[in-house]
């Protein structure tokens, strides 16, 4: 009986560690992306110019605000 209990405790500890590791790493990645977005102003300007649009400062800032607001809405849903 002691061997079965030991195996059960080891399996439960392993499963708990995996679940905690997944949760913490996901939270860390979400915080990193929120602090340092992947799409910055220069990348957005380059993308707009490749699509044939003239990237004015007002348009770039408008698109960045839209992206940030969508990220906030998406993070609140979770």
Curated annotation (Swiss-Prot):
It is a single-pass membrane protein. The chain crosses the membrane at residues 3-23. Keywords: Cell membrane, Membrane, Transmembrane, Transmembrane helix. It is found in: Cell membrane. This is UPF0154 protein SSU05_1707. GO terms for cellular component: plasma membrane. Belongs to the UPF0154 family. Its main location: membrane. The keyword Lipid metabolism does not apply. The keyword Methyltransferase does not apply. It comes from Streptococcus suis (strain 05ZYH33).
